[in-house]
Regions:
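Compositionally biased intrinsically disordered regions enriched in Thr/Gly
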Residues: 1-259
Length: 259
């Protein structure tokens, strides 16, 4: 069943991209033309690919409200890229029926940003809150997608790095306030919240289950997201590492953040 979406803006452009023509902008308005545009391009993906922000609004029932902002790409491999993004968005908007009464009210509100786009990878982050009527309070959360543009597979932290005790040690020594596009705490509280992630305060360590640790890439570094105590003001915490500080643990042959 098609997703209910609305367009929020003109297509966003990566640095150095030429302005899209009026005809190209119009082509982004329908999924069918996304497919045609993809078919007419070569299999090579470049940083000239552009996108527009859309809003996913399909609610699971009439009691609920869903607003999830997401990027819709056009250009080469757009159909495959958009399918991966939309699958994540639909998952964010869904409820496990075994955990809740029939047709509960759910309000979901998420923003998103493309944090890195080049010929090798697209990295997208979503952040916002979910309020379910049977829950004590709304929860805040962050989701991330890192799409390898050659394999069209999702890339996780453990695909990128050897996450071991040495990596964890470097994290707590070198991590810094991530600034744009999303931070769950103020810069003034960053050191305090980082300390709360150490084994002195948090057991098991968030790095124990690195498979599920969320991350997104930026031009200069990688941002890791981990759970936080709700009473501290947010349900998640983010910290950034420069690629140069963790190069010894990097696994892939290709350098994703370089063209």
């Amino acid at each position: 069943e098609p997703a209910e979406t609305v367009s929020l803006s003109e297509p966003e452009h990566m640095e150095g991209s030429a302005a899209a023509s009026v005809e190209e902008r119009d082509r982004t308005k329908t999924d069918a033309l996304h497919k045609n545009d993809t078919a007419n391009n070569s299999s090579e993906v470049t940083s000239e690919n552009t996108y527009e922000m859309r809003l996913y609004t399909k609610a699971p029932n009439q009691n609920s409200t869903i607003k999830i902002q997401y990027p819709a790409f056009y250009g080469s491999k757009a159909e495959e890229i958009n399918s991966l993004i939309l699958a994540k968005v639909q998952d964010m908007a869904s409820l496990d029926p075994s955990l809740f009464p029939e047709n509960p009210r759910i309000d979901v509100n998420y923003q998103s940003a493309v944090t890195l786009q080049n010929s090798k990878i697209i990295s997208v982050v979503f952040w916002g809150n979910t309020d379910i009527e049977v829950s004590q309070f709304p929860t805040t959360d962050l989701y991330a997608l890192n799409i390898d543009l050659t394999s069209l597979e999702l890339i996780t932290l453990k695909d990128l790095y050897t996450v071991n005790a040495e990596f964890e040690k470097v994290f707590f020594e070198k991590a810094f306030f991530p600034s744009d596009p999303i931070t769950s705490y103020s810069e003034e509280k960053f050191s305090e919240m980082l300390k709360l992630q150490t084994s002195e305060y948090t057991l098991p360590s968030p790095f124990t289950n690195a498979d599920s640790m969320r991350c997104f890439l930026k031009p200069e570094g990688i941002v890791l997201s981990m759970p936080a105590i709700h009473a501290s003001g947010s349900d998640h915490f983010e910290a950034e590492l420069l690629y140069s500080d963790i190069q010894d643990y990097y696994l892939p042959e290709q350098i994703y953040w370089n063209e």
